[in-house]
Design a protein with these regions (language model features):
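Residue in the alpha/beta-hydrolase core beta-strand immediately N-terminal to the catalytic nucleophile
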Residues: 137-139, 164
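C-terminal catalytic histidine-bearing segment of alpha/beta-hydrolase fold enzymes
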Residues: 234-287
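Gly/Ala-rich beta-loop-alpha elbow adjacent to hydrolase catalytic centers
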Residues: 142, 146
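The feature captures the conserved acid-bearing segment of alpha/beta-hydrolase catalytic domains
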Residues: 163-245
């Protein structure tokens, strides 16, 4: 009986129909772990087959996963891709953008059971198994706080299944140097080979040149983040230059693409457009 109850707990997933936004999407409540549940908002393509890809869309501090998902619908409607937008609720996952590994003030969270460094791997396994998908890789996008999540997942995710990623306008970063985590990797070292792997990935790194407000309401102003620059644009420039230096140090060319959007500030919709083109490329149905 106890074994049955354990299995019931593992596979307890709730399907919901949601029409509260301006489009229809489905929701699966992922509860197959000991962490707090996460609602996965998703939209299926016209036809799902073994070649269908999965693209994860990670929200920012606003946590409005439905709005983030809506920005991809028109461009993806004829593509062979499942769009998935996890909703990390604030009460359940207050520090989602650090993968739950540290607070935004820099305090390490020692309870690894709440860490989100296995989250995308588990979410992908669900969709892969449910729809019999052949690909072992997925695509992922994050803007602002979502960009923080994605670049740290590239560093600390339990899987290495990211095929392509696009990240835009993070408020601050984890540098590959000896500063205390989450500003650096002190006390949170990367596994062997991880630097070379993340350097080799196809990543679009986006910044808006007008995202330079040092007094933006959601900008992290802790000492560690201020050492990275006074605003998002400067911090992004410094982080990308840092990656180039790390690549030279490890004799590993940085494959990431760098793109500055002229005249754009911290605008989710406008910054998402180049990511859409980048990640949806080559996802047409095959004859």
């Amino acid at each position: 009986m106890m074994k049955y109850l354990k299995l019931l707990k593992i596979f307890l997933i709730f399907f919901l129909a949601n029409k509260s936004f301006s489009f229809d999407y489905s929701v699966v409540r992922y509860s197959a772990w000991e962490k707090a549940d996460v609602d996965l908002l998703y939209v299926l393509p016209a036809e799902v087959n073994t070649e269908t890809k999965v693209l994860f869309i990670i929200h920012g501090a606003s946590r409005d996963a439905d709005r983030y998902l809506s920005m991809w619908l028109d461009a993806a409607k004829d593509k062979n891709v499942i769009l998935v937008a996890p909703h990390f609720k604030k009460n359940d996952h207050p520090y989602f953008s650090t993968l739950g590994m540290a607070s935004y003030s820099g305090k390490i969270i020692k309870d690894q059971d709440v860490w989100l460094n296995d989250s995308i791997a588990k979410f992908y396994a669900y969709f892969q198994n449910k729809y019999n998908l052949s690909s072992e890789q997925y695509l992922i996008y994050g803007f602002s706080g979502g960009s923080q999540f994605v670049h740290r997942y590239l560093m600390y995710g339990v899987d290495k299944a990211i095929e392509k990623a696009a990240i835009g306008s993070a408020g601050w970063y984890t540098f590959i140097e000896s500063s205390p985590f989450p500003y650096g990797i002190k006390d949170m070292p990367l596994e062997p080979g991880r630097i070379e792997w993340l350097m080799s990935k196809e990543v679009l790194f986006l910044l808006g040149d007008k995202d330079n407000n040092p007094n933006h309401s959601t900008l992290n102003r802790t000492k560690g983040s201020m050492l990275q620059g006074s605003n998002r644009y400067d911090r992004g420039i410094n982080y990308f230059d840092h990656l180039i230096r790390i690549g030279n140090e490890f004799n590993t060319p940085l494959r990431w693409r760098f793109s500055v959007m002229r005249g754009i500030d911290h605008n989710t919709k406008k910054m998402t457009q180049p990511a859409i083109k980048f990640l949806l490329k080559d996802l047409d149905y095959k004859d």
